């Protein structure tokens, strides 16, 4: 085969040629091209007049000498109009029931069927066999059909629990299209003088029959790594738990995996990558409700698990917690010891802060975490002036729990060793301590763990950078994944600076 990167570049240029003169249809063209290159079917949902038929017509030009067939279904459509008329000569002379298929669906590489759900049972049954087995029964003979891409279109979804569901399940890729939205694109579309039916693809980019057949075998050789399978299984398990999730047949999952293999192959890779799984958003939905649900679940998968984002954050949380434990273990050494003032005749003992404590805001660590005001608290932030007044005059004292929110009323006291002790509602106490000196830096154990975590983050980010060069994935999805990885990296760096 050609060098993988050269093949990826060629397919990218082929797609760009097919997209010329079509506005806001790049994603649809690219997925239809991927379907054509892997022998799959596409369903286009949308109102009339939004270039659904033109998309299918364009795909004919992706192949050298490809034949196309298109037909607008009605309730009165007959099999003869789709599969060819009966041969009167064969019936008369030889008594054979045979169709003349030249120029009809059985001899076309690219097929477009508009208003597909209006087709009658006779057409649907034959069409199912054509899609499933790439075969057509013509009289007593079974003939192979060359169909590489079937594009079916409608402005509505099939009725639930109807005889149409079997055909709908065969439409692997499902795209919901709308009118041109962008103002500049709308203007360009109105003023374009390009003949939409002209061939925009140079011969050098068109796919030959030999290449197409060879690629079908090579697509099947693309591997599915264990970690990618685990992501797919995680998605499947999650969908099974959701009451409103669409039913996804085993057949659809299997066909979807081949589409992912094709995406990897035409992106120059030898294995399916997590980024390819984004294509499942156009394969697993059934209706408008499930479309949104599937996109949400895949978004969670991509931004939380595909590059171990959530796993790295969990590890980071454990490291931070361990760091706090180490700090708390040192709290006896760094416990804040207040100074007892003279006051023999005073009714209340008075104290003051040590002279070396000069910050206007003090963050004091709890020797052991306490639950205060329904929050697990590991440190409290005080205003120095408020703490000094309390030490001197008593009364109410407030502090911010874990340094966040509004200052909360606290049960604070000075014990016999002149340490500050905070108590919860059950009067369990925890000594307050000064944080370790910043000059001490991170403990070696914590520093090593953070360095290992940062190294793993860099590996995951590098993997994503290598894999994101995928023609078939929209850029906004790649942007969200990049943002999720950058957020993890920022949290790791912040922990390293503590």
From Swiss-Prot:
Q: What is its EC number?
A: 3.6.1.-
- Residues in coiled coil: none
Q: What class of enzyme is it?
A: hydrolase
Q: What is its quaternary makeup?
A: Homohexamer. Interacts with ViaA.
Similarity-based family: Belongs to the RavA family.
Instruction: Check the record and name the PANTHER family matching this protein.
Output: ATPASE RAVA
Q: Matching InterPro entries, A to Z? A: AAA+_ATPase, ATPase_RavA, ATPase_RavA_C, MoxR, P-loop_NTPase, RavA-like_AAA_lid, RavA_ATPases, RavA_LARA_dom
Q: Classify the main location.
A: cytoplasm
Give the protein's recorded name.
Answer: Regulatory ATPase RavA
* Activity modulation comment: ATPase activity is stimulated by ViaA.
User: What keywords tag this UniProt record?
Assistant: ATP-binding, Chaperone, Cytoplasm, Hydrolase, Nucleotide-binding
Q: Write down the chemical reaction(s) this protein catalyses.
A: ATP + H2O = ADP + phosphate + H(+)
Q: Gene encoding this polypeptide?
A: ravA
Q: Signal sequence: where?
A: none
GO molecular-function term, one example from the UniProt record: ATP hydrolysis activity
Q: Which GO terms describe its cellular component?
A: cytoplasm
Function of this protein?
Answer: Component of the RavA-ViaA chaperone complex, which may act on the membrane to optimize the function of some of the respiratory chains. RavA functions as an ATPase.
Q: Where in the cell is it found?
A: Cytoplasm
| Binding-site positions, ADP | 23, 49-54, 196
